Amino acid sequence: MSGRSVRAETRSRAKDDIKRVMAAIEKVRKWEKKWVTVGDTSLRIYKWVPVTEPKVDDKNKNKKKGKDEKCGSEVTTPENSSSPGMMDMHDDNSNQSSIADASPIKQENSSNSSPAPEPNSAVPSDGTEAKVDEAQADGKEHPGAEDASDEQNSQSSMEHSMNSSEKVDRQPSGDSGLAAETSAISQDLEGVPPSKKMKLEASQQNSEEM
């Protein structure tokens, strides 16, 4: 209970303080600064003077002040509303700037995306290079086979040439042998009777035909 009573006292004190402040504000509202002449002299002083107008005028003034305050608040509210509008404009500008900032980012992304296919295109090129290398390696291997085949062909051609040369050598040797045989036979025929010469010539012709 003590806590509640303390709270009630503080509330009542606060209310009293608020009332005093409001009364002081009302008194101040009843005062205003004016140029006032001092006594019978011509001196004029600008100081706070209580309002000397009747209460009706005070009420009207208070109403006018309230209206002015409302108008001022309304004027301030458009300013506030305009300030949010300006904030919106700033937001739009910031959005535009962010979009402008994002557009270079997009351009960078597009530029990054465009180099990205280049590695991909480079990969096929690497593949083609690998294929070319493989083809070259195969070509290197195949040329070995081709060299072997060329060697075989050359060997076969050499063999053919050797065989042909041997045949050629054999033919002249055969011809020379035949010539020697014919010469020997002719020499033999010189000391042989004509009947035997005919037989030998016939045998030579048969051997030549064979």
Swiss-Prot record:
Cellular component GO terms, alphabetical: chromatin; GBAF complex; nucleoplasm; SWI/SNF complex
Segments forming a coiled coil: none
Per UniProt, location of the Glycyl lysine isopeptide (Lys-Gly) (interchain with G-Cter in SUMO2) cross-link in this chain: K199
Modified residues (Phosphoserine): S203, S207
Biased composition (Low complexity): 108-125, 151-165
Polar residues bias: start-end ranges: 74-84
Pfam families from the UniProt entry: BCL_N
Region annotated Disordered, chain positions: 48-210
Keywords on record: Chromosomal rearrangement, Isopeptide bond, Phosphoprotein, Ubl conjugation
Biased composition (Basic and acidic residues): 54-72, 128-145
GO biological process: chromatin remodeling; motor behavior; negative regulation of cell differentiation; negative regulation of DNA-templated transcription; neuron projection arborization; positive regulation of cell population proliferation; positive regulation of double-strand break repair; positive regulation of stem cell population maintenance
Classification via InterPro entries: BCL7
Family statement drawn from the similarity comment of this UniProt entry: Belongs to the BCL7 family.
Recorded disease: Chromosomal aberrations involving BCL7A may be a cause of B-cell non-Hodgkin lymphoma. Three-way translocation t(8;14;12)(q24.1;q32.3;q24.1) with MYC and with immunoglobulin gene regions.
Identification of the protein by name: B-cell CLL/lymphoma 7 protein family member A
Annotated organism of origin: Homo sapiens
Name of encoding gene: BCL7A
